[in-house]
Amino acid sequence: MLRYYKNNELILEKLDEPVTNCWIDAINPTPDEKQLLCNLGIPMDFITYSLDIDERSRIEEEDNGTTLIVVRIPYFMGENVDIPYITVPLGIILTDKYIVTVCEKSTETIEMFASGKAPKLSTTKRNRFALRILMRGTTNFLDDLRAINKTVDALEDKLYASMQNTELLEMLKYQKSYVYFAQALKQNELALYRISKLSSFKKYE
């Protein structure tokens, strides 16, 4: 799915087609949608990397200035699965005309922006927009960690009361989520450090 947005003076508006200085959000794009992005100057490799579930957080910059930022963000799979919270790669692609986000999943991080809940958001200030996405991803990690801690605390109370294997297995599920989060945050830290060193990445536009 492809979605297009551009801000006016007050709100973020959804568009029917891409225009200069818009935000393009790609969620598990089809082959035709990937080709459409390529026709807009987005490297196919950047799209492919962003959709690879095992992709690590990193930065890549082309000679023409097009930049790929890959970070891992939290994703809630549901309570009745082996690992309730995992992380997925989010690609942020910056060109001279667009900011493009690419992810296999529909995530809370991106939906907050798409819903128009982010104040003073400018699609023309692409680098700043990217930084706000990164900040939101960090906030989502904190929110999900609080939720995990709350669940684990409740499971510990049940464990002390019952000493049943069920509670132990449930706690193990959330322990796996801790591991995923720790690995992702370490990768993101290195990627953010590299962003701070990019000469082409201006923090204020």
Predicted segments, located by residue:
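Peripheral, non-transmembrane regulatory/ligand-interaction domains of membrane transport proteins
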Residues: 1-204
